[in-house]
């Protein structure tokens, strides 16, 4: 197990508490509607599906309260700042915000399915009870709607034998909002798959804004009061457990039982979602305000492999290493905002991003900046926002792993290190950095070469050659490149990058790398930072667990992954 417990105990505890609250709320609501005398007559028509529908509704309210919080980026950045002196275990939980957002969404889907299925049975029971002519208690209760609805005594929402379930579904507030919410939820979930987010980000972006219809629908879903229970006054006058068996004698002079009166369950969903909705509205207002501040593009560089570098200035902009921003180009799309990691260092007088062509929006943006005689497109920026990479200097030893354009957060870190060396910063806690960059194309290395060359020279001059150990891996090589590398193996610099460190072909042998690091730093706390695909994250996470020790006096690896 290695230090799996050390890395994940708080996450597991948090999930257990969240799941426990879901179970508690479901069971508590189920027993309430299954046992309470107030809903005795309602159960005579619907049975236990009433309790299932109401229990799932309560869990939907609870999870809908939580769903917006993990995507309040300014709130997370604020918490990250206030938790700067908290334990790394607690701070790491903020990096799992999107994972928790997805888990809450899955729970909403589960309870939505339970709620819909339960109400399908409920409407079927309502319909059959309304059609019944056998004089049973259910049929008598269903007929109360005929002439006493104005008095508040109706129980069955199907008001006549000619009314269909479909008609009630699309004409009642509960039915219509339920359909709208379900359609919005289905579209949001299906468009949030990794394939669509990676290949058709604009589809994901637009459909996810259907949450507005989901939240509005949830807020007014219960206004119609379709689920009804006996009023307190009516129960005091005619208790259901005493009077249900003598329903044929209701209102007889010689009987103490009177015809029951019912009232709708007051809407509660709006109470659950009000606070997070207000918080999210404030979040969006802040985003809008910051996005309207003028951004000045000071430099545009087109690197090989279709990588665009933008250097910008913005009044009041302050950043930390590894942070990211959201970028909008109104001339391409007014509503689309895309996240990009900052590649500049906090010590620089500008902030920069590197954009690789990966989809329609990025391709259009690069094409717009390639037009030499056209005016530079206007750019809007929101951020910056914090990520796991902010904590890199909290570790004695840091392992940085970037795949392709995923190297961008580490560009910021390495630049900041260069400036710290320039200023002789003695507060730098980090004593060793291992940097791995995995790329398919040789051209991708070019824009990073100058930085690595400068770092090599700076560390040589300061006598800190061993501070940075970097390895570049080329996965898209062919026999010509390998042959050329073999012929020039004795050269002092690499033929691909021009750096002193030779490029490796293929992928890293992570077990060997971690074993070497663990041996070299037997008593250190090692932070492993990744910006790359899920498969690579899985391999690195396993290695962190395998080569860590529960003994705090021995080496421990803490895995961190960029999520935005």
UniProtKB/Swiss-Prot annotation:
Q: Which residues are glycosylated?
A: 162, 236
Q: How does it sit in the membrane?
A: Multi-pass membrane protein
Where in the numbering of this chain does the FAD-binding FR-type domain appear? 284-391
One of the Pfam families matching this protein, by short name: FAD_binding_8
According to its UniProt entry, the protein's GO biological process terms are:
angiogenesis; cell migration; cellular response to hyperoxia; defense response; extracellular matrix organization; hydrogen peroxide metabolic process; inflammatory response; intrinsic apoptotic signaling pathway in response to oxidative stress
Query: Which stretches are transmembrane?
Result: 10-30, 45-72, 103-123, 169-189, 207-227, 397-417
Q: Where is FAD bound in this sequence?
A: 338-344
Q: Which sites bind heme?
A: 101, 115, 209, 221
Domain annotation Ferric oxidoreductase: ranges: 54-283
* Renumbered residue ranges of the record's region Interaction with NOXO1: 397-536
Cytoplasmic face of the membrane = 1-9, 73-102, 190-206, 418-564
Q: Which GO terms describe its cellular component?
A: anchoring junction; cell projection; early endosome; NADPH oxidase complex; plasma membrane
The entry's localization annotation reads:
Cell projection, Invadopodium membrane; Cell membrane
The Phosphothreonine modification is found at 430
Oligomeric state and interaction partners are given as:
NOX1, NOXA1, NOXO1, RAC1 and CYBA forms a functional multimeric complex supporting reactive oxygen species (ROS) production. Interacts with NOXO1. Interacts (via FAD-binding FR-type domain) with ARHGEF7 (via PH domain). The phosphorylated form at Thr-430 interacts with NOXA1 with greater affinity.
Pathology noted in the record is: Defects in NOX1 may play a role in the pathogenesis of very early onset inflammatory bowel disease (VEOIBD), a chronic, relapsing inflammation of the gastrointestinal tract with a complex etiology diagnosed before 6 years of age. VEOIBD is subdivided into Crohn disease and ulcerative colitis phenotypes. Crohn disease may affect any part of the gastrointestinal tract from the mouth to the anus, but the phenotype of children with onset of Crohn disease occurring younger than the age of 10 is predominantly colonic, with a lower risk of ileal disease.
Per the entry, what this protein does is: NADPH oxidase that catalyzes the generation of superoxide from molecular oxygen utilizing NADPH as an electron donor.
- Name of the protein in its database record: NADPH oxidase 1
Source organism of the structure: Homo sapiens
